[in-house]
From Swiss-Prot:
TM stretches of this protein: none
Organism for this UniProt entry: Rhodococcus jostii (strain RHA1)
Main location: cytoplasm
Quaternary structure and partners: Monomer. Binds 30S ribosomal subunits, but not 50S ribosomal subunits or 70S ribosomes.
Extent of Low complexity compositional bias: 125-136
Gene Ontology molecular function: ribosomal small subunit binding
GO cellular component terms given for this protein: cytosol
Protein name: Ribosome-binding factor A
Primary role: One of several proteins that assist in the late maturation steps of the functional core of the 30S ribosomal subunit. Associates with free 30S ribosomal subunits (but not with 30S subunits that are part of 70S ribosomes or polysomes). Required for efficient processing of 16S rRNA. May interact with the 5'-terminal helix region of 16S rRNA.
Cellular compartment(s): Cytoplasm
UniProt keywords, alphabetically: Cytoplasm, Ribosome biogenesis
Length: 162
């Protein structure tokens, strides 16, 4: 086991090395729109998981996840050698590439929030034209003290006998 801070620093360094290598050194067109989003390293520093996203060529096109995964698998050996040269650790971690689901989850959450905002706006629109049920002032009026109440409130020893 190793210090968690060291594992985090190594994970960050591996992510930087892999992202730089994908951008500048690997000439595979399938990796043109791949972005490294996160990297995790196991506690024994033997395995590294690299999370990535793939964007489409333009805003309307769907990303080709299968082609990007195949390109990363093909470049895995080159990327691992770059990581070994760039980190200087005794054992170069094996690289595993996983498509990151965070952007899809975030998009789904945004859709749910937009739907909730629309429902809130609808409720506010309906409530604007509504009138309250019952009396306008639903709270009870304070009771006025009657003469009968005043007699009850007097202490029992202070009453005069007839």
């Amino acid at each position: 086991m190793v210090d968690p801070a060291r594992a985090r620093k190594l994970a960050k360094r591996i992510g930087t090395i892999v992202a730089t290598a994908i951008d500048h050194e690997i000439k595979d067109p399938r990796l043109a729109f791949v972005t490294v989003t996160d990297t995790k390293v196991t506690a024994d520093l033997h395995d590294a998981t690299v999370y990535y996203t793939v964007m489409g060529a333009d805003l309307e096109s769907e990303p080709d996840l299968a082609a990007a995964a195949a390109g990363l698998e093909k470049a895995k050996g080159v990327l691992r050698s770059k990581v070994g040269a760039g980190t200087g650790v005794r054992f170069t971690p094996t690289l595993t590439f996983v498509a990151d689901t965070v952007p899809d989850t975030a998009r789904h959450m945004e859709e749910l929030l937009a739907r909730a905002r629309a429902a809130d706006d609808e409720v506010a629109r309906v409530a604007a034209g509504a009138s309250p049920a019952g009396d306008p002032d639903p709270y009870k009026e304070p009771r006025a003290e009657d003469a009968d109440d005043a007699e009850v409130d007097e202490p029992s020893g202070s009453r005069q006998a007839d």
